[in-house]
């Protein structure tokens, strides 16, 4: 499902533990780390996609988390030219993402990145909130910055309570 401008709808997930750290996952077979994310299927709401992706990529059911916040609108990133598949139709030039911040309610031992037969991650760790901005691939960095800036007041206000 690609929109008229060539962007694929997608959800991004920032999962927080009680200490305010965020879930940071290593892409399988690569030295590349990111937040969980995934496409929104036809006739699926962003929230439905969020919970499907959370189960597929992190192994957590909806009751294991609480949605703390969602971005007000779509955040977009464009793929580098070398990653665009010009032979596919329609051509996907990037992702438009609805981001969600989740609070982990379950024990972290329930996290399972090999829940499906085709896992996306082969490792994970908790990192400080702003750490991902210096580590994520450059073409996703501005979207991460915008989502994290929007969510920071919510997270840090919760920590003060």
UniProtKB/Swiss-Prot annotation:
<dbReference type="Pfam" id="PF00293">
    <property type="entry name" value="NUDIX"/>
</dbReference>
<dbReference type="InterPro" id="IPR015797">
    <property type="entry name" value="NUDIX_hydrolase-like_dom_sf"/>
</dbReference>
<dbReference type="GO" id="GO:0016462">
    <property type="term" value="F:pyrophosphatase activity"/>
</dbReference>
<dbReference type="InterPro" id="IPR000086">
    <property type="entry name" value="NUDIX_hydrolase_dom"/>
</dbReference>
<comment type="similarity">
    <text>Belongs to the Nudix hydrolase family. RppH subfamily.</text>
</comment>
<comment type="function">
    <text>Accelerates the degradation of transcripts by removing pyrophosphate from the 5'-end of triphosphorylated RNA, leading to a more labile monophosphorylated state that can stimulate subsequent ribonuclease cleavage.</text>
</comment>
<keyword id="KW-0378">Hydrolase</keyword>
<dbReference type="InterPro" id="IPR020084">
    <property type="entry name" value="NUDIX_hydrolase_CS"/>
</dbReference>
<feature type="short sequence motif" description="Nudix box">
    <location>
        <begin position="38"/>
        <end position="59"/>
    </location>
</feature>
<dbReference type="InterPro" id="IPR020476">
    <property type="entry name" value="Nudix_hydrolase"/>
</dbReference>
<dbReference type="InterPro" id="IPR022927">
    <property type="entry name" value="RppH"/>
</dbReference>
<protein>
    <recommendedName>
        <fullName>RNA pyrophosphohydrolase</fullName>
        <ecNumber>3.6.1.-</ecNumber>
    </recommendedName>
</protein>
<feature type="domain" description="Nudix hydrolase">
    <location>
        <begin position="6"/>
        <end position="149"/>
    </location>
</feature>
